[in-house]
Amino acid sequence: MSEPVLSRFLRLIAFDTQSSETSGLHPSTPGQKVLADALAAEFRAMGVSCRVTEQACLYAEIPATEGLENLPALGLIAHLDTSDAVSGKDVRASVVTWEGGDIPLGKSGLTVRPPDRMKGMRIVVTDGTTLLGADDKAGIAEICTFCERILEEKRPHGPLKIAFTPDEEIGEGTLFFDYAGFGAKFAYTLDGGAIGGIEYENFHAARAKVCVSGLSAHPGGAKGRMFNAQTAAMEFHSLLPPAEVPEHTSGREGFYHLCAMKGDVSYAELDYLLRTFDSDDMENRKNLLLSAASFLNKKYKREAFRVEIADQYRNMREFIEKVPFLTEYAFEAMKRAGVTPFTSLIRGGTDGAKLSRNGLPCPNLCTGGYGAHSRTEFACVEEMESCVQILLNLADVFREHAVRA
């Protein structure tokens, strides 16, 4: 008898897999390898062959039903880590059958109010001191439950390829991805939110560091001599559009996000995230930073400002549109599950963005998790169960279309 997705999910969120942007290790935290090894043991108990790499990438595969070996492989991917923005250690979860109103989160003073359509459904919440970890342990739980059920029910299927990656939250989920070893030419990430969601358009992303060199002097005799790197950095920031920041943008609007700053009189740094859905707009944003630095260097007659820009990932839409059947099959699988599908923008990135750019088209599917990266994160059990059914249907759709072809 397959394990319910809820009990599997509750086991998974007990693992502390918060990633770290500063450790310099791969994986960035040891808990991710611990979880990968535990999941490998689960797969082997199902009779599924799998391997875990030194960097905590897990790969599993279920061979095709006899006679269907030549069908194209279906790949499913989720990530092991949780956000470094909020603690994911010692998660105290509870399951509430929601009948309306606010759900209090322990003694934290925080509350959650799910959408009205969830009345009568089971909601998994925390005590308000940690995130829940539905991003992305809901995706992992759903994939594992799908694998268990497709084997238990002896449903005919083509080759199935599974991957769980580390460090997605810090942008390193695909750093050591074994494309050839994975063995699928296309896949889906399960890293979305609301039931029915299919995402294949995400931000173009870049990171910029603005370095400001100052000149220190004794404050009592600094007139005409001191060049304060901190106030110069503030002036640089003032040249950027004040409304184009995360807290004032939505939909297709891009932004400049000052995510970190440090410094003293002699030296200061500003770290920015640049985000937009349009490639031309991304170039404009980069050029604005460079122009601001050039303007201030001329104004102060010194080479005080330097801008370093590095691309992070691209909008995967251009890659997914070349294989439209991926979204069409997902739509069909959802409709068979009684779910109304919809497309939405990812105001962020997923492993799928980098995978798609590197030749593995990979749209993103829903998991039934909400409020990611926060202490008010929650998951809907009935939606998680629907996600498992969607995956079963997806395997059917892939098989049916391939056989007809």
Question: What are these regions, as identified by a protein language model?
Answer:
Residues S2-P30, V125, Y313, H373-S374:
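N-terminal capping segment at the start of a domain
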Residues E21, T53, P156-P159, P242-H257, ...:
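Flexible, glycine/charged-enriched surface loops at secondary-structure junctions
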Residues L68-P156, F164, S386:
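Active-site metal-coordination/substrate-binding segment of hydrolases
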Residues C144-L151, E235-P242, N393-D396:
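Short glycine/serine- and small hydrophobic-enriched flexible loop segments
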Residues T231-H248, F255-H257, A304, R314-P363:
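Active-site-adjacent substrate-binding region
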Residues E99, S108, R113-P115, M121-A134, ...:
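Midchain, well-structured core segments that form catalytic/ion-binding scaffolds
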Residues G24-I77, D81:
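A non-catalytic alpha/beta surface segment that caps or lines the substrate-entry region
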Residues D264-S266, P341-I390, L394-F398:
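Zn-dependent metallopeptidase/amidohydrolase metal-coordination segment
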